[in-house]
C-alpha cells in the first residue's frame, strides 16, 4: 500500500482535519467507556505539538441528517477531551462552511452525521470538508468500511490525505497477521450463527493452517459431522455449507478440529446445572453452551504451537460463569503464547477485559465491522481512497 502517513508529514502551521472514531457509549450524559477517546490522544497531541490548527470530527450514534439533537451531540466528548488534554476544546456547531481555528489550537466539530449528505458520501459536502483543511487525516479504522463524506469523499478532494497513527497501526497489525504471517496461522472464529460469519469462514479457510470454530457456529459443524446437538442453537440449512468448508480446508492441508467434549445444560440460564459430555453423548434436550475441558486443552496446545493467532469470538456463553471456562482457557493460552496475536470484535474484547489479558495480546483491534470486512478480504473504501491518493 502507498498510503501517506500523518507521521511522515510536517504539520507546522497547517490546517489539519482529523476524522476520529469518538463514538463512545453515553448514558444520561455520562461517558461509560472512554477507550476510543484515550486511543485518539496520541494523534491529537502529535498534531498540536507540531503547531497545526487542529479540527477533529467524529460520528456519534445515528442522528437524523440536518437535525441537531442533544442526545447525539459530541458535547460530553468535548468536555472529556478538555480534561484529558488540559486545555479548552471548544465544540463547534454548523461548521461545514468554515471553521475559525488557529495554529496550536484544537476544536471539536459537532457530530458529522448531522450534516446533510454525510451518509451518502455526497460530493458537494465532501468538497466542503476538503476546503476546510490543508491536510485531511483519516484515523477512524472503525468506520473505514463505510463510504461516507467524512471517511471517503473528503479523501478524494483534500489537498493532502493521510492515514493517522491509529488507522495505520491497525492496518500494519492486520497485514502482519494475514499477508505474511508467522506459521502456523490459527484463526478462532466463534459466534451464534454461521450465516453471519460465512464470508469470513470461507475467506480464512483459504489462508489458515488451523481454524477453531466456537459457539453456535461450532454446533452447526458438529451437526454436519453427524452428531446430535439436542436443542442447541445451530443452522440446519447450512450443514452442507459447513461440510464444504471442512472439505476445502482438508484439500489444502488445513485443519478444522471439532470438539471432543462439550459443556451442556438443560436451560439457557446463568445458574443452570452444567454437565460435561462427550460430543457423541449429547441428549435431545441438551443445550451445548461451551467446549469441554479436553477440547479446551487440545485447542490451547494448538495456540501454544501457533506462530500467529487471529481471534474473533468467544467459544462459549462466557457471560455465564459455568460456561466461561472454554473461552478463559483459550484466552489464557493466547496470553501465554509466543505467537503474534490479534483480537477483534465486541464480544471478544469483552472476553479480553473479563480475563484481563489485554497486555498479553499483541494487537487489539477496535474496528468491529471494519475488522471483520478486512479479514473477509474485502476492500475498505477509506483505505482504498487513501491508497489511491498516495499512489
Swiss-Prot record:
ATP binds at residues 197, 319, 345-348. GO terms for cellular component: cytosol. Its EC number is 2.7.2.3. GO terms for biological process: gluconeogenesis; glycolytic process. One of its GO terms (molecular function) is phosphoglycerate kinase activity. InterPro entries: Phosphoglycerate_kinase (IPR001576), Phosphoglycerate_kinase_CS (IPR015911), Phosphoglycerate_kinase_N (IPR015824), Phosphoglycerate_kinase_sf (IPR036043). PROSITE patterns: PGLYCERATE_KINASE. Substrate binds at residues 21-23, 36, 59-62, 113, 146. It catalyses: (2R)-3-phosphoglycerate + ATP = (2R)-3-phospho-glyceroyl phosphate + ADP. It comes from the Bacteria. Its main location: cytoplasm. Pathway: Carbohydrate degradation; glycolysis; pyruvate from D-glyceraldehyde 3-phosphate: step 2/5. It is found in: Cytoplasm. The keyword Transferase applies. Keywords: ATP-binding, Cytoplasm, Glycolysis, Kinase, Nucleotide-binding, Transferase. Belongs to the phosphoglycerate kinase family. PANTHER family: PHOSPHOGLYCERATE KINASE, PHOSPHOGLYCERATE KINASE 1, CHLOROPLASTIC-RELATED. HAMAP family: Phosphoglyc_kinase. Monomer. This is Phosphoglycerate kinase.
